[in-house]
Every structure is written in C-alpha cells, then in structure tokens.
C-alpha cells in the first residue's frame, strides 16, 4: 500500500469516528512506520473505544464506500475483539480492535499522540499509539502467534530507536 491509498482508506473512517466522538488510535505497521522505517503492510490497524449505541450511525456514515456489517461490529464490541472494514475503492482492509478493559490498554489510550503519517507539514494528523505501546503490542502479537512471525519482531528495533 502506498501512503495516498492508506489515507484514502483511513480518512473517512477517522472522519466518522471524530464526528461520533469515538476515541481511536492507529497502531500496527502503519503506526510503526511513522516512528521507524516505513515498510509495506497488508492492512491498517485501529484501536477504538466503540459503544453499541453508535454502531448504526457509524454504518450510515461509511456504508457507501466500505463493506461494513453492524452485527459483526456489535459482536466485536460485546466480545472486546475486532472487526474488518473494507474500503471499496482501494480494497484496503482496516482491522478495528475494540479497546480492552485491561489496565495496559487503558493506559495506552492515554499515551497516544497526534502525528502525521508522512513527513509533511500539510499532512493530516491522526491519533497514533506511542512508540513504546507499538513495541509492546507487537511483542504481544509475536507471543500469541507462537513466536514465529518475523513481521511483528522486525519492526521492534526500528521503532525502539525513535
């Protein structure tokens, strides 16, 4: 994915989240690329503090340009898991993770910061997970994946240098 496609897929979701007062942060490889060495990625990861009462409004705002399923979102909120959005013009997948109730996740939300995805004075700012939280999340995903995925561990040294 290239930065213009990432922003084309991400901006309407962020616009909808902000219009509905949904707190979010960008993480995963998109987030680690901001703090470290940019690399290709297959999706965009967001963590969001979603409430069931806002699901229908979110769907209405995004249904024209995204594959979005209200029942799947409601299940993700209830289970504190994730759901996918597909940006139809670019076919980019956005994984949205419901914020968990663990202390770490709550603290991570308090440490997020506004950053641009590119080195541009004019670029839009997004809420991003802190470099430290991206490292910890990547290590956690590495552990949950049986410690075999190089994708999670490769980003760590580059983010850590920031």
Where are these regions (language model features)?
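Compositionally biased terminal segments of proteins
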Residues: 1-162
